[in-house]
Amino acid sequence: MSVVDLSLWEPKTALGRMVKEGKIRTIDEIFANNLLIKEPEIVDILLPGLKQELLNLNLVQRQTHAGERNQFQAVVAVGNEDGYVGVGIGKSRQVRQAIEKATREAKLNITPVRRGCGSWKCSCDEPHSVPFVVSGKSGSVEVTLIPAPKGVGLVAGDVAKVVLRLAGIKDVWTKTRGDTRTTLNFALAVFNALRNTYYFKL
């Protein structure tokens, strides 16, 4: 992940200014107040230990009035492995710029994840799995996350494992429908399922 000198950051939004001035000290405050993150630097400040994983890099063609143009499309996941995760997509004619755009979008899309011990086979009360069965969808792909007891691990495809690990999920069973070979939709379906753990009304 490229290093940004946050001391040189000039916030463009009211939320950004509040974060830089220390009026908002945790990312939890942002979501508790339903505020919208429009600057990735906010995430850099409030989640300094954020990790990044490149999920996919493809060469895609874009039709323009001048003909076809090749671009790189990057899919990136970010997370702190402790209840926050984001997924983003970026396109550019340069690989590095595509990855940077995807990383920026992933930070802007970051969401809290509600974790727990939702399996009836386990009663440890530790946040190692999801607290209940939850689903997410993107395109033709639908992913269902099922609470698993401690020690099961991540029973999921490779792309899903990365997103789940970055969110801080250690044990889960998954069910999938649709074309999971499409990395973008697969990653977004898992991300949407994780996001639904937070917004689901108990």
Curated annotation (Swiss-Prot):
GO cellular component, one term: cytosolic small ribosomal subunit
SUPFAM superfamilies: dsRNA-binding domain-like, Ribosomal protein S5 domain 2-like
Alphabetic keyword roster: Ribonucleoprotein, Ribosomal protein, RNA-binding, rRNA-binding
Gene3D superfamilies: 3.30.160.20, 3.30.230.10
GO biological process terms held by the UniProt record: translation
SUBUNIT field: Part of the 30S ribosomal subunit. Contacts protein S4.
Protein family membership: Belongs to the universal ribosomal protein uS5 family.
Entry protein name: Small ribosomal subunit protein uS5
